[in-house]
Curated annotation (Swiss-Prot):
It is found in: Cytoplasm; Mitochondrion intermembrane space. One of its GO terms (molecular function) is electron transfer activity. Belongs to the anamorsin family. Keywords: 4Fe-4S, Cytoplasm, Iron, Iron-sulfur, Metal-binding, Mitochondrion. This is Fe-S cluster assembly protein DRE2. Component of the cytosolic iron-sulfur (Fe-S) protein assembly (CIA) machinery required for the maturation of extramitochondrial Fe-S proteins. Part of an electron transfer chain functioning in an early step of cytosolic Fe-S biogenesis, facilitating the de novo assembly of a [4Fe-4S] cluster on the scaffold complex CFD1-NBP35. Electrons are transferred to DRE2 from NADPH via the FAD- and FMN-containing protein TAH18. Its cofactor is [4Fe-4S] cluster. It comes from Meyerozyma guilliermondii (strain ATCC 6260 / CBS 566 / DSM 6381 / JCM 1539 / NBRC 10279 / NRRL Y-324) (Yeast). Residues 141-162 are annotated as: Disordered. GO terms for biological process: iron-sulfur cluster assembly. Residues 291-305 are annotated as: Fe-S binding site B. InterPro entries: Anamorsin, CIAPIN1, Dre2_N. Monomer. Interacts with TAH18. Interacts with MIA40.
Amino acid sequence: MAVLLLLHPTVVTDPALAEASKKKWIQNDEEVTQHIIDRVANNIVEVPQNHYSKVVYINPNEAQHRGLPAQTIEQIFGFLKPEGKFCGDLPIDQNLDAIMSGFVVEDEHWLKPKPMASVAIPLRKKEKTDKNEPKKLPIFKKLNQDPGMTDTSASNTDEEETAIKRKLEESKLSYFSDDSDGEDDLVNEDELIDNSGLNYNLVVPKKCELPNGKRRRKSLLKIVLCGLKEVGGRAKDNRQRTLQDQILGSMAQLATKEAIEIEKRLAKSVKFTEDELTEVDFTVQGKTGGCNSCALGDAFRCDGCPYLGLPPFKPGEAITIDGIDEDWS
């Protein structure tokens, strides 16, 4: 029986471990071929297809570090014969990859199933007929006995209609019946009142009169009690007005405080006099522009100076047209 032994690179560094693994998985009568799994996965070594009855993978690492690429699992599947086994230090969490490659996952190994033989299913040949021969129409048999009427939409007899109307009148569904005449019975409201219910004793208060015919005066206490009701209502209104006055008063105080603060801010603001707000006259001594050099000449004047083009002058000196007559000529 041909056996392929795939060794992890760490096994090669320890010859004693390699020999112990061979004794564990391989018997004396088996033909063994060993390769490093990296060389097999990278196609450096040529391995025959469908040749080995068993492939043993030896990996001394822990179980969670024994993973194999899905492509390598497919290669191992191709090395095995039908019903061949892949055993050894198998990865613990790649059963799905093994199934996708074609293996049948079992407890201690992965099995390559034997391919199922194809079964030929004979097809029934149609009888050849002459194309010119006309096709026969299907034949239907007529029933010997007519079936009974099962249509419930047949018209009812007069007795059935009478029975149905009587049932509708006896039940509450008579209100929804379409056979009603559409006339509503009017009820007289006066008949609902019984005359016996009207003969109840009415309590009539006695007149405030004395036996001698004089009217009894109301006592001071009653007058006070009657007045308390009015006083209570007025007190309630007064409380509401007082509450409203308090709210309005607090709002007025807040408005006054804000007005005082605004006045304080306005008092601190910078105010200009009329002399300061008037247009600057550069012909008057002490009045200067932003550059303070309007009287020196164009070389010292700013871009917006109104005296651009005029000769230099002294502050306070009157400028006449005769002085610049030569420049305009």
